[in-house]
């Protein structure tokens, strides 16, 4: 009789997800500030890991792996080169019980998927460029943007834009 290998528990997945996210962020940080090499294979490797994880346990929810690791899984997914997998995970995230996936993570991923599919974003989370060239990608129904953002627990767009412009070296026009 063959013995079955025990399934890893949430803590095992949490540890692995956080390790992959740490690698992801270290590479990006070195690239941005230190002129390190961009390693696209890291995103592919992280996607393979996440694909295996999702096949085994579904989307890594807050209850299963904790808030930090659930958001770290989202971060890895944001950097995935596989848009179909991103869309699949977005549906899993939306289907999770309320409070099991951060609404912010869902909103940002939905905007990323819209952008990659050539559609206007819904929550206004995605910008392009840096400094004076920083601009918001097109947004669907801009008049109701803050209403949609509030429903996902996001700050008003003007506040978010100011934060983004401060991070990337440019103040919004009203602050000049």
Predicted regions and their residues:
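Expand to "…catalyze enediolate/carbanion chemistry for C-C bond making/breaking, isomerization
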Residues: 127
